[in-house]
Design a protein with these regions (language model features):
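Alpha-helix N-cap and coil->helix boundary residues
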Residues: 4, 62-69, 175-179
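A general secondary-structure junction signal
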Residues: 9-11, 71, 197-199
Length: 278
């Protein structure tokens, strides 16, 4: 009971195969395929991590440098405690911690502490508009950044890679759209991928669907994404196609990542062994 799905696999020898099912949406019978553009949500994070590691490779930053030296705004993001109070962080934050989800930044849907601190819309499960103030750290998704533990002391899936996107912009002097296009998408020939894509691609975009918590029925979700973004969230704002994203993955599998970066090896082995019961 889903409108569409595209499955694909890539191998080291360059082989790819895709299987597609369904139509563009529950309201549009246009067939989908490997060239259909989607909003790829958190699959954006792997691209942002690659961009960050390119800057490590260039010597602009080291994985374990305190980022507050280049991004002092991090000092202002306090730790949200279980009783709802805030306190100052004890430790500086590193790029490694932002990329491996040990920085303390969380999403409202991964942290009960944050979920309790904001009001959620019962119809969507997302924060109400008044709970999503504009901020200068990490735009585009969820709530104003909160940390729930000190950097390096635990693990939680969250907004750290999005914050890393802000660091990339600060270090490179370019916005994420410009940087990733020039340094990742164009070198790999990913012509149907970007934060801002052509109007032709926007017209082909597969819309999101929502399932009613009351009836279980699917419907096309309102498109809240502007046709052109002015600010770019490294944790989830990219548009891409299955074929383009497979090109990115094949690059990593074949070792062609060396043409984009060498520091990928620094994050290829596990960087988090265990926290708590993990």
């Amino acid at each position: 009971d889903i409108p569409n799905i595209v499955l694909g696999y890539v191998t080291r020898d360059g082989s790819t195969e895709f299987l597609s099912y369904g139509s563009l949406s529950s309201e549009d019978p246009t067939p989908i395929g490997e060239d259909t553009p989607y909003m790829i949500a958190s699959m954006t994070k792997a691209v942002t991590a690659t961009a960050a590691l390119q800057l490590v490779e260039s010597g602009a930053v080291a994985l374990d440098d305190p980022l507050e030296e280049v991004f002092p705004e991090l000092r202002e993001v306090q730790i949200l405690q279980e009783d709802g109070t805030l306190r100052a962080p004890k430790h500086p934050t590193t790029l490694r911690q932002l990329l491996n989800h040990t920085s303390g930044f969380a999403y409202f849907f991964t942290s009960p502490v944050i979920a309790q601190a904001v009001k959620l819309d019962p119809s969507s499960g997302f924060p109400l508009p008044e709970e999503v103030p504009e901020d200068r750290y990490d735009w585009g998704f969820g709530i104003q950044p909160r940390r729930i533990f000190d950097a390096g002391e635990d693990w939680i899936y969250g907004r750290g890679v999005g914050v890393a996107g802000r660091v990339i912009e600060r270090l490179s002097g370019e916005d994420l759209h410009t940087y990733t296009k020039a340094n990742i998408f164009e070198p790999l020939g990913m012509s149907r991928t970007g934060y801002n894509v052509s109007q032709e691609l926007i017209a082909q975009l597969a819309p999101l669907h929502l399932r009613s918590p009351l009836t279980g029925e699917l419907s096309v979700a309102p498109n809240m994404r502007p046709a052109r973004l002015e600010r770019f969230y490294g944790g989830g704002d990219l548009i891409s196609t299955p074929k383009d994203y497979a090109t990115f993955l094949r690059c990593m599998l074949k070792g062609l990542a060396a043409s984009l970066l060498c520091s990928s090896l620094a994050m290829a082995s596990p960087t988090v062994r265990s926290f708590g019961q993990l």
